[in-house]
Curated annotation (Swiss-Prot):
Primary localization class, coarse: membrane
Taxonomy of the source species: Eukaryota, Metazoa, Ecdysozoa, Arthropoda, Hexapoda
Chain ranges passing through the membrane: 6-26, 41-61, 143-163, 183-203, 250-270, 292-312, 365-385
Entry protein name: Putative gustatory receptor 47b
Tissue distribution: Expressed in neurons of the terminal external chemosensory organ of larvae.
Length: 414
């Protein structure tokens, strides 16, 4: 793989999956083959895929509900609250998928420009620093093969959960279609999350490269060539900040919708698992699959927040090191002017990875999600205890009342 095709080599397969899932209408190619593009064929394919997945999933759910035998097998043993949880999950996975598609469609032009700038980024760096060696193989190993492994596990857990939830051998075709479409809908959350993480890591690695090159140039002899290269690194850091701002614009809303979906499904499944533990009933595979689902969503929330924090830390370190330019070349007016201009620019450009438009994506996001999840689970468990106490009180009251015989009319003579 040529170095000019590094972005496609690392992330091209992930973007192909986004297109196959119907999430985007963009197809990514190397610059020699025209670069990223969107045409009527990709749009038609995406619209067909979206319609097929959402309509087929909702149709299979309605089929299960309308058939008395299948409905009794799936929902007859569940409490009203757990039924509401499963209903919410069916609606939320479809709504989140639609939100993803609409958000990315609205940002399509911006997305195309972002991909084009990332494809051009490395080639421009090699023109000034030809000795730089990009480790594309490591990035591909981490994101493409990592996505395949996690995706295979998620597919296995989701399909197994649906088959175990149906609790009925009747309606196998509808069960297969429901399991397949549900898995595609829910896996879209993780797939887009991996692409978001990959681009954050792309920017983080370039900011680290700026620091490594600066350390070398700060120790070099004072010459015009050194100052020209340092000036390029200033521009390179600004381009990274611009890419980060564009990344937030393209993926910010989708990332917020994805984390909210992770929060809701983990809250619901953790409550169902807690209910099973409190009632001291024997476990069945359905709850094991729920626990594995929670583990996958936990993994996504943790690594997304972690990469957001690592990007923020790398950016701060890079900005701080650039601000030391005038200190290393104290006798140069060009260094002093460049540092002053950069400090002024830095005051007005404090980009960081965001969830939505206001929430910083950092380690604190993990606390925010799990603190909220714990609070809601505690409330639901308290509600479960209250329902159990009411039920026990009703049973006790029934045992305390003994009917001896029929009571006659009561008059004033009594």
């Amino acid at each position: 793989m040529q170095r000019d095709d590094g972005f496609v080599y690392c992330y091209g397969n992930l973007y192909s999956l986004l297109l196959y899932w119907g999430l985007v209408t963009i197809r990514v190619r190397s610059p020699d083959r025209g670069g990223a593009f969107s045409n009527r064929w990709t749009v038609c394919y995406a619209l067909f895929t979206r319609s097929f997945m959402v309509i087929c999933f909702m149709a299979t759910v309605m089929t299960k509900l309308r058939d008395p035998e299948m409905s009794a097998a799936m929902f007859g043993h569940l409490s009203p609250l757990v039924k509401a949880i499963f209903t919410w999950e069916c609606l939320s996975c479809s709504v989140t998928y639609i939100e993803y598609c609409l958000s990315l469609d609205l940002q399509k032009d911006r997305h195309l420009k972002l991909v084009a700038r990332m494809q051009e980024f490395d080639r421009s760096v090699l023109m000034v620093f030809p000795h730089v060696q990009w480790n594309y193989r490591r990035a591909r190993l981490k994101y493409w093969y990592g996505t395949v492994i996690v995706g295979f596990c998620f597919f296995s857990f989701s399909i197994s959960l649906i088959f175990d939830t149906t609790r009925c051998t009747c309606g196998i075709p509808s069960t297969l279609l429901m399991a397949f479409t549900y898995t595609l809908l829910t896996s879209s959350v993780g797939l887009l999350g991996f692409v978001h993480i990959g681009i954050m890591d792309f920017i983080r690695v370039r900011l680290r490269l700026v620091q490594q090159l600066l350390h070398q140039l700060y120790q070099a002899d004072d010459s015009s060539e050194v100052h020209e290269r340092i000036a390029y690194l200033f521009e390179m850091s600004k381009r990274c900040s611009f890419l980060l701002a564009e990344l937030n614009g393209v993926f910010g809303f989708a990332a917020a919708a994805g984390i909210f979906y992770d929060f809701t499904i983990m809250t619901c499944f953790v409550y169902v698992i807690c209910q099973k533990l409190l009632e001291r009933e024997p476990w069945d595979p359905e709850y094991v699959y729920m626990l594995l689902h929670v583990a996958i969503h936990t993994y996504k929330v943790v690594i997304t927040s972690t990469y957001g924090y690592l990007l923020l830390r790398e950016k701060r370190n890079c900005m701080h090191l650039l601000s030391q330019y005038s200190r290393y070349f104290s006798g140069q007016d060009v260094a002093r002017r460049k540092t002053e201009d950069f400090q002024h620019w830095r005051m007005h450009n404090r980009q960081a990875a965001m969830v939505g438009s206001t929430t910083l994506l950092s380690v604190s996001t993990i606390y925010l999600v799990y603190n909220g999840m714990a609070n809601y689970v505690i409330i639901l468990v308290q509600l479960l205890f209250q329902q159990q106490q009411i039920k026990d009180h009703q049973l006790t009251s029934g045992k305390d009342v003994d009917i001896v015989g029929p009571m006659g009319p009561i008059t004033h003579m009594d």
